Amino acid sequence: MGTTNGCAADSVAATYYDSQDADQFYEQVWGGEDIHIGLYATPDEAIATASDRTVHALLDLADPLPQGGCVVDLGAGYGGASRRLARWSERPVHAINISAVENDRHRRLNVDAGLEQQITVHDASFEQVPMADASADLVWSQDAILHAGDRAKVLAEVSRLLKPGGCFVFTDPMAADGVEMGLLQPILDRIHLPDLASPSRYKAWGEAVGLTMEVWDERTEMLVRHYDRVRQDTRLRRAELETSISSGYLDRMDVGLGHWVDGGQQGRLSWGLMRLRKPG
């Protein structure tokens, strides 16, 4: 990305996700466990069910893991994936997240799940992860790196963290390859970003730091379905949601979700599952 200072981008993301409105919205509409795009079996499937399916699809991409290292979750949100990773991998999980509000909820949920000793939640940016080189077998991220001030630097951190043979599995809302950023201005304005990554840019950033793209499973239709599903659910539950979320926030969210749906339908956006590997 490179056009936004990393600290400034961190501040924008933290301010947004730390707000009471955002915290309540993601808890009530997404279910309070995950904050990422779902893989839907049917158009009207529950958001939480579809979101959980994405986690399992990424777990399939990560399997099998090498032995001996830990797992790092970049942009861990409420920790839904971190808890699944802890149970699945049976090894330490380090959750990196900039939002103090999300991290507080994450820690409480870890205690409820009996996983507080296995999962360490770091109040940190994924551009400067407070961990040693070559310490992770798996780095994981879901729909978070778009908020980074320098996405190439995030890929460099991933390469630094991974042990030889380890892999990085992730999803991220992106621009379709070759799309001019001006065509995405309504989306960029909504999320306070100058641009989005693209599949080819992630491939190039990975190669520049020694990571090879092994899998690119394009599922852009799920981005469209997800944001449309969230918008429908928000509209149906408007009266209920207004008891804890401001009407202005809900109005802005409705408009923003519409921009994502339109961009996906117009072929200007891209989303899917990716795996990059550090050669052994």
From Swiss-Prot:
Q: Name one GO biological process term.
A: glycine betaine biosynthetic process from glycine
- Name the Enzyme Commission number(s) assigned to this protein: 2.1.1.161
Pathway terms, separated by semicolons? Amine and polyamine biosynthesis; betaine biosynthesis via glycine pathway; betaine from glycine: step 3/3
Question: Catalytic activity, per the record?
Answer: N,N-dimethylglycine + S-adenosyl-L-methionine = glycine betaine + S-adenosyl-L-homocysteine + H(+)
pH-dependent activity: Optimum pH is around 8.5 for dimethylglycine.
Matching Pfam families, A to Z?
A: Methyltransf_11
The GO terms this record gives for MF are:
dimethylglycine N-methyltransferase activity
At the top level of its lineage, which domain of life is listed?
A: Bacteria
PANTHER family found in the cross-reference section: GERANYL DIPHOSPHATE 2-C-METHYLTRANSFERASE, ZGC:194242
State whether it acts alone or in a complex, and with which partners, per the record.
Monomer.
Q: What does this protein do?
A: Catalyzes the methylation of dimethylglycine to betaine with S-adenosylmethionine (AdoMet) acting as the methyl donor. It has strict specificity for dimethylglycine as the methyl group acceptors.
What is the designated name of this protein?
A: Dimethylglycine N-methyltransferase
Q: Which gene encodes it?
A: bsmB
